[in-house]
Amino acid sequence: MELAEDWLVESLRLYQDFHAFDLSGATRVLEWIGEKGVFVAGYESLKKNEILHLILPLRLSVQENQGLHPERDFKVRHGGFSDRSVFDLKHVPDTRLLVTSGLPGCYIQMWQVREDNDVIEAVSTIDVQDKEESLWPRVSVFCSKAPGILHGARLSGLRTVDVESQKITYSSGTADSESLSCLQVLDANTFAFCGNSGRLGLVDTRQKWAALETVSPGSGCSGERWCAEVRNKGQGPGPCIASLGSDGQLCLLDSRNLCHPVSSAQCPVFKPSPDPELLRVTWAPGLDNCLAISGFDGTVQIYDVTSWDGKKTQAEPLFTHKGHIFLDGNDVDSAPLVTTHTWHPRKPRTLLSAASDSSLHVWDWVDLQAS
């Protein structure tokens, strides 16, 4: 309890802003729509799960230090129910459409956010090629005049389906059965993938399958399960791919040479991730060479990778969000597990994070080293 009390006092110095919200169920989904709205969705099995469109607190636009605000001041704009668990959700830009994936993974679901009422309704399903009991398809969205849904649980089952016609516009055509941990569309013709084993690849959909990829994690990068994210163009110089292992190994790679990491570091995690499905690494859209990781415990860790060199180093976080541990009086051993996090698209140091106890936090952290 003393640790929790100490953190509450320290939080006035650590955060420019902090809001807490209790969802009706835990979420693995935090998907932005604009700068003020976010989608969340439940992932419990054998029950209906809510899909909600939340509007963030208006006071986030206030600049002065406001301290803690553990109150229910998020607003529900739209809502709906899914008959299955929702592990991933993507908004189709410039439309009112959503796509969700989860278990059972025999299809992905299309949804429409109604304009004339507050309902999110299911409108269609898209069959997937890999129909295995324990696998669910990863999804990403090609943004163009004719948007497409990229999906697949394995490399062999990767397909793109046109949103309007639901015709298949791309198929990987490979027999490679590597299971996927994440997919990320990069532009109108290319996407990146990360396999559970750590394989990374860049694919041009205009060409026959010939992915520029790593065969396995590079030298010095060991781990049982992996996830990755590619930094958007224009986010500063340096390595553009971050790959995170379930043992806390973090590798930075250049897209022109995926076989050899530019640098790697060991993050200070006390034990491997208890649920590698929840591993997440994200680049900060408004800060150069800054990223966040979660999925190991009740924290979100933020790193400045500017000083990392080619040697394996012991990384120290620039900031650690411990609100999911201490805000409700938990101790470290009984703390909930952070299920996901995301950066605000416009506010450089503002993040959202969710945890297995159904808590949802939005927080603007202070860079104490800079101050």
From Swiss-Prot:
Function of the molecule: Component of a multiprotein complex required for the assembly of the RNA endonuclease module of the integrator complex. Associates with INTS9 and INTS11 in the cytoplasm, stabilizing the INTS9-INTS11 heterodimer and blocking the active site of INTS11. BRAT1 then joins the complex and plugs the active site of INTS11, leading to WDR73 release and nuclear import of INTS9 and INTS11.
Subunit note: Interacts with INTS9 and INTS11; the interaction is direct. Part of the multiprotein complex composed of BRAT1, WDR73, as well as integrator complex subunits INTS9 and INTS11.
Source species, domain of life: Eukaryota
Family matches, as SMART domains: WD40
Gene behind the chain: Wdr73
Record-given protein name: Integrator complex assembly factor WDR73
Cell compartment(s), UniProt: Cytoplasm; Cytoplasm, Cytoskeleton, Spindle; Cytoplasm, Cytoskeleton, Spindle pole; Cleavage furrow
Gene3D superfamilies: YVTN repeat-like/Quinoprotein amine dehydrogenase
